[in-house]
């Protein structure tokens, strides 16, 4: 018996659940932006190739506590360097962080992975060849005429929310051609706290205008005042209605000058 059979894992049911989860995640990424969807396809290409490389080298890491694909990316996909780093962490962490051989997997597993890679490569190439982005075009077209219309945007400030850092980068690149854009994510929120407050919090003692647009992920969806702005754009819409209300609550605060 294969190792996973000895451990009595329900492979088929787990596989079906993962398929549904991946489908949902890809739909959400596509809903966010074309840029985010392409980034996800590119990640899937790398993840699939990483697995194929590990099978070829007879060194397959399955480590719940280690970002195996992240280690490959850090090593610029140098197999020896990546696997050395993974093995070092695996030994330190122990637990369920395991290394398998290719013989622990079904004989047709590699063939199926190779087929997956061909499909993903084809999808990525087709999406990369198409430069059209109607959603981003509509955003750029409405940026000054609608979102910064002085009749509705009386403060000259704009808050943009997105669930994806890839989408955030694309928005900032386009909007940054005419506006001063502040990008905030989990990676830099703490170091930008004073800047955020001075530029977007109506209650701040120091008021600055270094930025007129803040593009943020969900990291600022709660626990922060952004009410110097009275216009919010949800570039993508969270499926959780509570999260949407939390976003809107960033500008609907006591102290706002907006009517």
Describe the residue ranges of each PLM region.
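Conserved RecA-like P-loop NTPase helicase motor core
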Residues: 176-259
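Helicase motor interdomain insertion/brace
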Residues: 1-187, 192-198, 222
């Amino acid at each position: 018996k294969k190792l996973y059979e000895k451990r009595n894992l329900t492979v088929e049911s787990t596989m079906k659940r993962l398929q549904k989860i991946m489908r949902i995640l890809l739909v959400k990424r596509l809903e966010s932006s074309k840029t985010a969807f392409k980034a996800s396809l590119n990640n899937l290409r790398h993840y699939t190739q990483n697995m194929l490389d590990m099978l070829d080298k007879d060194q397959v890491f399955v480590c719940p506590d280690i970002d195996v694909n992240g280690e490959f990316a850090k090593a610029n996909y140098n197999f020896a360097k990546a696997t050395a780093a993974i093995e070092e962490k695996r030994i330190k962490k122990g637990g369920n962080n395991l290394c398998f051989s290719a013989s622990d997997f079904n004989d047709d597993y590699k063939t199926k992975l190779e087929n997956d890679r061909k499909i993903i490569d084809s999808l990525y190439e087709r999406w990369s060849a198409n430069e059209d982005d109607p959603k981003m075009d509509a955003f750029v077209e409405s940026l000054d005429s609608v979102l910064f219309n002085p009749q509705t945007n009386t403060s000259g400030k704009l808050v943009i929310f997105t669930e994806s850092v890839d989408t955030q980068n694309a928005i900032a690149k386009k909007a940054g051609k005419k506006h001063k854009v502040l990008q905030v994510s989990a990676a830099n929120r703490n170091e930008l706290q004073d800047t955020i407050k001075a530029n977007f919090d109506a209650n701040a003692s120091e008021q600055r205008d270094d930025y007129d647009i803040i593009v943020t992920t969900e990291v600022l969806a709660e626990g922060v005042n952004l009410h110097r702005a009275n216009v919010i754009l949800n570039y993508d819409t969270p499926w959780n209605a509570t999260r949407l209300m939390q976003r809107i609550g960033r500008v609907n605060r006591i102290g706002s000058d907006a009517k």
